[in-house]
Amino acid sequence: MKHARLFSLLALLCSAVGALAQGAAKPATPAPTPQAPPTIAAVIDREVGIIEKEFVDAAEAMPEDKFNFAPTGLNIPGSDYKGVRTFAQEVKHVATVNFMLWGAVTGDKPPVDINNGDGPASMTSKADIVKYLKDSYALGHRAAKSVTAENVVGLVPSPFGSGTISRLFCATFSVAHGFDHYGQMVEYLRMNGIIPPASRGNN
Protein backbone atom coordinates (compact mmCIF):
# COMPACT_ATOMS: atom_id res chain seq x y z
CA MET A 1 0.00 0.00 0.00
CA LYS A 2 2.84 2.27 0.95
CA HIS A 3 4.62 1.45 -2.33
CA ALA A 4 1.46 2.18 -4.33
CA ARG A 5 1.12 5.62 -2.77
CA LEU A 6 4.79 6.31 -3.48
CA PHE A 7 4.43 5.34 -7.15
CA SER A 8 1.32 7.54 -7.47
CA LEU A 9 3.18 10.50 -5.98
CA LEU A 10 6.14 9.97 -8.30
CA ALA A 11 3.84 9.77 -11.34
CA LEU A 12 2.09 12.98 -10.33
CA LEU A 13 5.43 14.73 -9.82
CA CYS A 14 6.72 13.61 -13.23
CA SER A 15 3.54 14.85 -14.88
CA ALA A 16 3.88 18.27 -13.22
CA VAL A 17 7.55 18.56 -14.18
CA GLY A 18 6.72 17.64 -17.79
CA ALA A 19 4.01 20.29 -17.95
CA LEU A 20 6.36 22.91 -16.56
CA ALA A 21 9.00 21.93 -19.10
CA GLN A 22 6.54 22.26 -21.95
CA GLY A 23 5.46 25.69 -20.70
CA ALA A 24 9.04 26.83 -20.43
CA ALA A 25 9.81 25.62 -23.93
CA LYS A 26 6.88 27.55 -25.46
CA PRO A 27 8.17 30.80 -27.00
CA ALA A 28 6.80 34.01 -25.54
CA THR A 29 4.29 35.91 -27.68
CA PRO A 30 6.10 38.91 -29.13
CA ALA A 31 4.76 42.33 -28.23
CA PRO A 32 2.82 43.96 -31.08
CA THR A 33 4.86 46.37 -33.14
CA PRO A 34 3.64 49.94 -32.60
CA GLN A 35 1.91 51.27 -35.70
CA ALA A 36 3.64 54.24 -37.23
CA PRO A 37 1.49 57.39 -37.27
CA PRO A 38 0.20 58.40 -40.71
CA THR A 39 1.99 61.12 -42.60
CA ILE A 40 0.38 64.52 -43.07
CA ALA A 41 0.12 63.76 -46.78
CA ALA A 42 -1.77 60.53 -46.06
CA VAL A 43 -4.21 62.27 -43.71
CA ILE A 44 -4.96 65.03 -46.21
CA ASP A 45 -5.22 62.60 -49.11
CA ARG A 46 -7.77 60.54 -47.17
CA GLU A 47 -9.90 63.63 -46.56
CA VAL A 48 -9.74 64.51 -50.25
CA GLY A 49 -10.89 60.99 -51.07
CA ILE A 50 -13.86 61.23 -48.70
CA ILE A 51 -15.27 64.43 -50.20
CA GLU A 52 -14.44 63.21 -53.71
CA LYS A 53 -16.53 60.06 -53.23
CA GLU A 54 -19.55 61.91 -51.80
CA PHE A 55 -19.45 64.78 -54.29
CA VAL A 56 -18.76 62.88 -57.50
CA ASP A 57 -21.42 60.29 -56.69
CA ALA A 58 -23.96 63.06 -56.08
CA ALA A 59 -23.04 64.79 -59.34
CA GLU A 60 -23.38 61.58 -61.31
CA ALA A 61 -26.74 60.79 -59.68
CA MET A 62 -28.50 63.79 -61.25
CA PRO A 63 -29.91 62.90 -64.69
CA GLU A 64 -28.74 64.86 -67.71
CA ASP A 65 -32.18 66.41 -68.27
CA LYS A 66 -32.22 67.78 -64.71
CA PHE A 67 -28.58 68.79 -64.47
CA ASN A 68 -29.47 72.48 -64.76
CA PHE A 69 -32.18 72.26 -62.11
CA ALA A 70 -32.66 75.11 -59.65
CA PRO A 71 -35.57 75.47 -57.21
CA THR A 72 -36.47 78.95 -58.44
CA GLY A 73 -39.50 77.67 -60.36
CA LEU A 74 -40.99 75.51 -57.61
CA ASN A 75 -42.94 78.40 -56.08
CA ILE A 76 -42.59 77.06 -52.56
CA PRO A 77 -44.56 79.36 -50.20
CA GLY A 78 -42.26 81.57 -48.16
CA SER A 79 -39.15 80.58 -50.13
CA ASP A 80 -36.75 82.88 -51.92
CA TYR A 81 -34.46 81.06 -54.32
CA LYS A 82 -33.78 84.04 -56.55
CA GLY A 83 -30.22 83.98 -57.88
CA VAL A 84 -29.24 80.57 -56.47
CA ARG A 85 -26.95 78.37 -58.53
CA THR A 86 -28.26 75.53 -60.61
CA PHE A 87 -27.09 71.99 -59.86
CA ALA A 88 -24.61 72.19 -62.74
CA GLN A 89 -23.31 75.53 -61.51
CA GLU A 90 -22.78 74.10 -58.01
CA VAL A 91 -20.63 71.33 -59.47
CA LYS A 92 -18.63 73.69 -61.67
CA HIS A 93 -18.09 76.13 -58.81
CA VAL A 94 -16.71 73.50 -56.46
CA ALA A 95 -14.48 72.03 -59.17
CA THR A 96 -13.18 75.50 -60.00
CA VAL A 97 -12.36 76.34 -56.38
CA ASN A 98 -10.66 72.94 -56.12
CA PHE A 99 -8.42 73.87 -59.04
CA MET A 100 -7.71 77.27 -57.47
CA LEU A 101 -6.82 75.97 -54.00
CA TRP A 102 -4.93 72.83 -54.94
CA GLY A 103 -3.26 74.59 -57.84
CA ALA A 104 -1.89 77.06 -55.30
CA VAL A 105 -0.19 74.12 -53.57
CA THR A 106 1.22 72.47 -56.71
CA GLY A 107 1.81 75.60 -58.77
CA ASP A 108 -0.63 74.47 -61.48
CA LYS A 109 -2.78 77.02 -63.25
CA PRO A 110 -6.51 76.28 -63.70
CA PRO A 111 -7.04 74.45 -67.02
CA VAL A 112 -9.85 76.78 -68.09
CA ASP A 113 -11.21 80.26 -67.48
CA ILE A 114 -12.29 80.24 -63.84
CA ASN A 115 -14.87 83.00 -64.41
CA ASN A 116 -14.61 84.45 -60.89
CA GLY A 117 -14.87 80.99 -59.35
CA ASP A 118 -17.93 79.87 -61.29
CA GLY A 119 -16.08 77.92 -63.96
CA PRO A 120 -16.34 78.18 -67.74
CA ALA A 121 -19.75 79.38 -68.94
CA SER A 122 -19.31 77.43 -72.17
CA MET A 123 -19.17 74.11 -70.30
CA THR A 124 -22.77 72.90 -70.14
CA SER A 125 -23.01 69.13 -70.69
CA LYS A 126 -23.13 66.75 -67.75
CA ALA A 127 -20.28 64.65 -69.16
CA ASP A 128 -17.95 67.63 -69.51
CA ILE A 129 -18.80 69.04 -66.09
CA VAL A 130 -18.34 65.70 -64.31
CA LYS A 131 -14.99 65.21 -66.05
CA TYR A 132 -13.97 68.72 -64.98
CA LEU A 133 -14.93 67.79 -61.41
CA LYS A 134 -12.99 64.52 -61.46
CA ASP A 135 -9.93 66.26 -62.89
CA SER A 136 -10.06 68.74 -60.01
CA TYR A 137 -9.95 65.92 -57.47
CA ALA A 138 -7.06 64.29 -59.33
CA LEU A 139 -5.16 67.53 -58.76
CA GLY A 140 -6.29 67.45 -55.13
CA HIS A 141 -4.70 64.04 -54.58
CA ARG A 142 -1.49 65.23 -56.20
CA ALA A 143 -1.47 68.34 -54.03
CA ALA A 144 -2.12 66.32 -50.87
CA LYS A 145 0.80 64.01 -51.57
CA SER A 146 3.14 66.99 -51.88
CA VAL A 147 2.44 68.23 -48.34
CA THR A 148 5.00 67.37 -45.68
CA ALA A 149 5.55 68.14 -42.01
CA GLU A 150 8.12 70.69 -43.11
CA ASN A 151 5.98 72.61 -45.63
CA VAL A 152 2.43 72.18 -44.32
CA VAL A 153 2.26 75.68 -42.84
CA GLY A 154 4.46 77.18 -45.54
CA LEU A 155 2.85 80.05 -47.43
CA VAL A 156 1.79 80.06 -51.07
CA PRO A 157 0.24 82.87 -53.15
CA SER A 158 -3.48 83.16 -52.47
CA PRO A 159 -5.64 82.23 -55.48
CA PHE A 160 -8.29 84.66 -54.25
CA GLY A 161 -6.27 87.82 -54.77
CA SER A 162 -3.31 89.41 -53.03
CA GLY A 163 -1.58 87.92 -50.02
CA THR A 164 -0.60 84.41 -49.07
CA ILE A 165 -2.21 81.38 -47.47
CA SER A 166 -0.79 78.19 -46.00
CA ARG A 167 -0.86 74.78 -47.64
CA LEU A 168 -2.80 73.58 -44.60
CA PHE A 169 -5.52 76.16 -45.26
CA CYS A 170 -5.75 75.09 -48.90
CA ALA A 171 -6.20 71.47 -47.85
CA THR A 172 -8.72 72.02 -45.07
CA PHE A 173 -10.77 74.72 -46.77
CA SER A 174 -11.11 72.79 -50.03
CA VAL A 175 -12.68 69.87 -48.16
CA ALA A 176 -14.93 72.10 -46.02
CA HIS A 177 -16.01 74.09 -49.08
CA GLY A 178 -16.91 70.92 -50.95
CA PHE A 179 -19.10 69.62 -48.13
CA ASP A 180 -20.80 73.01 -47.83
CA HIS A 181 -22.01 72.82 -51.43
CA TYR A 182 -22.61 69.07 -51.23
CA GLY A 183 -25.37 69.80 -48.72
CA GLN A 184 -27.07 72.06 -51.27
CA MET A 185 -26.76 69.43 -53.99
CA VAL A 186 -28.37 66.82 -51.74
CA GLU A 187 -31.42 69.06 -51.42
CA TYR A 188 -31.58 69.48 -55.19
CA LEU A 189 -31.45 65.71 -55.66
CA ARG A 190 -34.25 65.12 -53.16
CA MET A 191 -36.39 67.85 -54.74
CA ASN A 192 -36.25 65.71 -57.87
CA GLY A 193 -37.15 62.50 -56.10
CA ILE A 194 -33.57 61.19 -56.12
CA ILE A 195 -32.06 59.67 -52.98
CA PRO A 196 -28.42 60.80 -52.67
CA PRO A 197 -26.08 57.82 -53.18
CA ALA A 198 -24.54 58.23 -49.71
CA SER A 199 -28.00 57.83 -48.13
CA ARG A 200 -29.28 54.89 -50.14
CA GLY A 201 -28.11 52.30 -47.65
CA ASN A 202 -30.08 54.05 -44.92
CA ASN A 203 -33.43 54.07 -46.71
Please describe what each predicted stretch is.
Residues M1-L10:
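Bacterial N-terminal signal peptides that target proteins for export
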Residues A19-G23:
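Boundary at the C-terminal end of the N-terminal hydrophobic targeting segment
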Residues A24-I40:
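N-terminal pre-domain segments of enzymes
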Residues D45, G49-V56, N68-G117, P157-N203:
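Short, contiguous alpha-helical
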Residues E47, P120-S158, S166-H181:
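Acidic/histidine-rich alpha-helical segments that form the ligand environment
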Residues I50, E54-D57, A61, L139-S146, ...:
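Solvent-exposed, charged/polar functional surfaces in cytosolic regulatory/catalytic domains
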Residues E60-F69, A143-V153, R190-P197:
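Surface-exposed helix-capping loop/turn segments at secondary-structure junctions
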